[in-house]
Amino acid sequence: MVTEAFEFVAVPFNSDGWGPPDASDVSSSASPTSVAAANLLPNVPFASFSRSDKLGRVADWTRNLSNPSARPNTGSKSDPSAVFDFSAFAIDEGFGLASSGGNPDEDAAFRLVDGKPPPRPKFGPKWRFNPHHNRNQLPQRRDEEVEAKKRDAEKERARRDRLYNNNRNNIHHQRREAAAFKSSVDIQPEWNMLEQIPFSTFSKLSYTVQEPEDLLLCGGLEYYNRLFDRITPKNERRLERFKNRNFFKVTTSDDPVIRRLAKEDKATVFATDAILAALMCAPRSVYSWDIVIQRVGNKLFFDKRDGSQLDLLSVHETSQEPLPESKDDINSAHSLGVEAAYINQNFSQQVLVRDGKKETFDEANPFANEGEEIASVAYRYRRWKLDDNMHLVARCELQSVADLNNQRSFLTLNALNEFDPKYSGVDWRQKLETQRGAVLATELKNNGNKLAKWTAQALLANADMMKIGFVSRVHPRDHFNHVILSVLGYKPKDFAGQINLNTSNMWGIVKSIVDLCMKLSEGKYVLVKDPSKPQVRIYEVPPDAFENDYVEEPLPEDEQVQPTEENTEGAEASVAATKETEEKKADDAQA
């Protein structure tokens, strides 16, 4: 096998610097070094570079020249240095150097694009994204897309939160309505609906009454024990039980004093403070309630049924948190109402000075038998003038008396009860001593109707002070044992201003209902608060309705008689006429 000998060429030495010597310098020398320098490829350029530049290929031995005529004239058809020629041909798109036919003017129009990513900030959110997604896009464009996606994600998250909150509120609203959907009285098939009045009409009413006249004061009052004003959650007091004392919840028409006053023709309208307070605060109510109305001659009696909802005290009526619907649950609306009534009775007797001293009045308790132990209560029969030919007499209750500034002052005693802090969100044992305002604000939100009715009753009775106790369970699951945590006192007029209870609006509601009922014929009627809508309805019922031998057969809601448009318009027209009469009287008084 014959092989060609491999000839080693001499490596030229450059005495002037690094790298091969310039070929132009070796023209006359005949040394091997000069000969090797003369054989160097003349068209291999030198390009300066930095470490941040991308490196391309040194030579491309597989490239076919697409435009051979553009090759510079080197005097040889097959120039071995063509593969190294960077100036005449674009070797690769990755180099960033190209020539358009070797024209220097066109080459000057090209600009290198900075491919370096922008410097990352040392602080700020570290958003994660796929580095291999859209690799061909520039880094600036990629950052803009990341910001746009971030904004879209924020909008989507806000939209989901908004929908979640709306659905959550709707669920609570539906559950709240479902818990209070049952009517306080079963609507019978033979009942005839006469009027339907929305609460929005009540809010526009206003009527000013003159100072009432005291007709009679019955019963006896014990003095308030001021030591209970010093009670705090740290020195709580156990709530006692007063089983031997009798409490009376007598309706209007069964009151012997009211019967006597009606016989003496002292007034045309008769009611109790609890019934009037229910009417005055009707727009704040959520649960269903009912009032029996009897028209006898030219007189009107507002009564309550035996075992009526008015005998109980609502708990968490105006709260957004739903209560258990099961009647057997200790935290259901009915169970809490019974518990609240029991707490109020015991609280009103425990905070008294039990030394036998009692303030007596004109007559004894009209409902007590001789020798019977009765609770401390006084009944104040007062008369208001509603019109020139119309007066209203109401029986108002007071629970205690005290000497304030050497003057006799009448008090009303009521108690708020805490059953489970998780429902209200405020633990009384932790907040009562340091944040009483927050506790009271929470109670106004959850029990606004009950507090408004207590205030209305205190105003009707002309009480000098309202005492409100804060009573809590010993344990959230123990509804028999309770403790008194604190007692606060308020003036009724000042407290009415705090809870936005307008006296003129209260009497405007009563006046409109009385005017509407005085237009009815003699008979028995019932006014029912709708269980699911903010409105009241007036039904005509048989004379034997709500008697002991009267059997009630509930009628489904969809089969109940609905009011005609004429009746609805008639009720609104009556209310509007009452409002016009009030405005005319006000103008005459100013004139």
UniProtKB/Swiss-Prot annotation:
RNA gate, as annotated region: 309-323
GO biological process, one term: cap-dependent translational initiation
Listed Basic residues bias regions: 123-135
Biased composition (Acidic residues): 549-560
GO function terms (MF aspect): mRNA binding; mRNA cap binding; translation initiation factor activity
InterPro entries documented for this protein: eIF3d (IPR007783)
Protein family per UniProt: Belongs to the eIF-3 subunit D family.
Entry remark concerning the domains of this protein: The RNA gate region regulates mRNA cap recognition to prevent promiscuous mRNA-binding before assembly of eif3d into the full eukaryotic translation initiation factor 3 (eIF-3) complex.
Function comment: mRNA cap-binding component of the eukaryotic translation initiation factor 3 (eIF-3) complex, which is involved in protein synthesis of a specialized repertoire of mRNAs and, together with other initiation factors, stimulates binding of mRNA and methionyl-tRNAi to the 40S ribosome. The eIF-3 complex specifically targets and initiates translation of a subset of mRNAs involved in cell proliferation. In the eIF-3 complex, eif3d specifically recognizes and binds the 7-methylguanosine cap of a subset of mRNAs.
Protein name: Eukaryotic translation initiation factor 3 subunit D
